A protein has these predicted regions:
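A short beta-sheet element
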Residues: 58, 63-112, 244-291
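Non-catalytic, surface-exposed connector residues within folded enzymatic/regulatory domains
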Residues: 23, 100-101, 131, 280, ...
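Internal, well-ordered alpha/beta segment that forms a basic, Gly-enriched binding/recognition surface
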Residues: 116
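Short, solvent-exposed alpha-helical surface patches in well-structured domains
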Residues: 106, 119, 139, 149-152, ...
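Sequence-specific dsDNA recognition surfaces
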Residues: 5-61, 196-243
Length: 371
């Protein structure tokens, strides 16, 4: 069964449906990710004219014509209607083509491959800002197997996604249990400033023995810093069980993390705290509170500065939390740690699904060639 070569322009229709009747509001506004997904928008649209937003119905595709290293693209697999700013380009697979030539789900798998982003970059134009427009999309060539083979490999992909989503739903249930305990404590207990339980560590790497350099991201994780410095002497040490945070703030998403790995060093933009008595307060329990959005709002309110916002140790120490019996803390921390481990597994499942997309496309082409 031979493969058939097309250019995408033969298979796609551009979507020019706008929200001119204002049927859809701010709750329908979405954005796209360069990981090829649709997400809640990160910017305020309260002052925007929603009548000029593009309407994307189930089965529709959307992409941002401004490009970085990857194309921001999404596929509406939900039963909901979304709207996007007119900075985006929307399209559908032509109905007659979707029946017998190209499944929209198969096209989405094709987009998920890293090969697509590499080819897309080759087709971009611009200097300071790269662009990939509708005409560029239509010029792309695609080899397609028979529709029955497409259905087979789409079914494999959907089964993997369904398994991951089922796992994710259980993950959110676990988080609800943890959040429920936290909220119940806050209602029933008097809160105390964390300054009563913590101290500020100022231990320096004076002898240069620690060479593991780390940074912290807004996902509350230690990471390898983007910029490295070979001079390890005099850097701030973070011991296992201590908490480090970035004193410079851009917004309420503070970079803070509990060190669970080996001792490391961080740059001078970080402060380090330790628990004075772990029979009264567990670092894992404290970290649960420092991971909550309300803590981000607190530090943004408590920070100081003009051009840059800074969080001092004194302001941090004023944050109040309920501090229950240590056994209650252990129980809550155990549930939360289970949630964190499962969240990491869920991210691994997502990565595996994305990694298998090139294999699925290749497998479908090889099966078609053999038929």
């Amino acid at each position: 069964m031979a493969l058939t070569k097309y250019v995408l322009g033969e298979l796609l229709d551009r979507n020019t449906e706008y929200n001119d009747q204002l049927k859809f509001g701010t709750e329908n506004v979405r954005g796209v990710l360069n990981t090829k997904g649709i997400s809640d928008t990160r910017v305020s649209v309260d002052t925007r004219d929603l009548s000029k937003f593009l309407v994307v119905r189930p089965g529709g595709f959307i992409f941002n014509h401004r490009v970085h290293d990857k194309l921001g693209l999404g596929y509406n697999t939900s039963n909901d209607v979304y709207i996007f700013t007119n900075d985006y380009v929307a399209f559908y697979v032509k109905p007659e083509m979707a029946k017998n030539v190209l499944l929209p789900d198969y096209l989405y798998i094709w987009y998920l491959r890293p090969e697509f982003d590499r080819y897309m970059l080759f087709k971009t134009y611009g200097s300071a800002t790269l662009f990939f427009n509708w005409d560029n999309m239509c010029e792309l060539e695609i080899e397609l197997p028979d529709i029955t083979i497409q259905r087979k490999f789409v079914a494999i992909y959907k089964a993997m996604v369904a398994n991951q989503q089922s796992y994710e739903r259980g993950l959110e249930d676990l988080k609800l249990v943890c959040d429920g305990y936290i909220e119940d404590l806050r209602r029933k207990m008097q809160c105390a400033p964390i300054g009563d339980f913590i101290g500020q560590s100022k231990e320096k790497n004076s002898d240069g023995l620690i060479t593991l350099e780390q940074g912290i991201n807004i996902e509350k994780k230690f990471i390898t810093p983007q910029r490295s410095n070979d001079n390890f002497y005099g850097r701030q040490i973070v011991r296992t069980g201590q908490i480090a945070y970035c004193t410079q703030l851009n917004n309420a998403n503070i970079a803070v993390a509990l060190r669970t790995g080996p001792d490391c060093i961080v740059s001078s933009v970080y402060d380090v705290i330790f628990i004075k008595d772990q029979t009264k307060l567990l670092p894992e329990y404290l970290m649960i509170w420092l991971s909550r959005r309300e803590f981000g709002r607190f530090v943004y309110w408590a920070s100081q500065g003009t051009s840059y916002e800074f969080l001092s140790y004194e302001n941090l120490a004023g944050y109040k939390i309920p501090v229950p019996d240590i056994h209650v803390q252990e129980a809550i921390a155990s549930i939360y740690n289970c949630y964190i481990r499962r969240r990491e597994i869920n991210e691994q499942l997502k990565a595996q699904i994305k990694d298998i997309c090139p294999i699925l496309i290749k497998g479908s082409l090889e099966e078609s060639a053999k038929a």
